[in-house]
């Protein structure tokens, strides 16, 4: 697991936040719950909606994150909005034809009581990350992890996938 604070510039963060706000009013969203395996969604009520980032934002993210992300020939970038009760139980990403996943947090302020914690397990035990603006988490497709259900607000991220 790789954890990076302030992974992008404030300017790029503002551009991402602006584009996300604009996309909220477009008919471009789909439910990611359709893609999750039933055992992964077990016990989770809410859903998460997704839409691709624009080519412009994708290019800017690739440039700013190129030294942080694993080298990969094809990257996919999507906005995710985790709604009330949305979360995902313990899983890894092996079944999804991905080499790695990365989560870039877009919430400006997030209270611990809002839920949406990213939890992972390794040889040293369990670890948690609260959503924090510009924080980047990178994990390989074998990393066991989950996201606790969102209690309040909307958990906004850019999910980055290194595709196989």
Where do the PLM segments sit?
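Non-heme Fe(II)/2-oxoglutarate
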Residues: 1-70
